[in-house]
């Protein structure tokens, strides 16, 4: 049986935690930031968890993570 390929786009966007959960970075933080408040930009910092409904699909894209 051949090796499964990791989706390279998913590998760049998601990281698997030691506990087994998947984390992702926040959207809406790349450009057009002048009209966003300091509070909204601060709340978009850091990583957040992936929704349970999406987790199965992401795990299929990252077979060796």
From Swiss-Prot:
The keyword Hydrolase does not apply. The keyword Iron-sulfur does not apply. It comes from the Bacteria. InterPro entries: Ribosomal_bL35, Ribosomal_bL35-like, Ribosomal_bL35_CS, Ribosomal_bL35_sf. GO terms for molecular function: structural constituent of ribosome. GO terms for cellular component: cytosolic large ribosomal subunit. One of its GO terms (biological process) is translation. Keywords: Ribonucleoprotein, Ribosomal protein. Belongs to the bacterial ribosomal protein bL35 family. This is Large ribosomal subunit protein bL35. It comes from Aromatoleum aromaticum (strain DSM 19018 / LMG 30748 / EbN1).
């Amino acid at each position: 049986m051949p090796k499964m390929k990791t989706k390279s786009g998913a590998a760049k966007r998601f990281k698997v935690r030691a506990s087994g959960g998947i984390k992702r970075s926040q959207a809406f933080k790349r450009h057009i930031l002048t009209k966003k408040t300091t509070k909204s930009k601060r709340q978009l910092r850091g990583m957040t968890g992936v929704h349970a409904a999406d987790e199965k699909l992401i795990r299929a894209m990252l077979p060796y993570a």
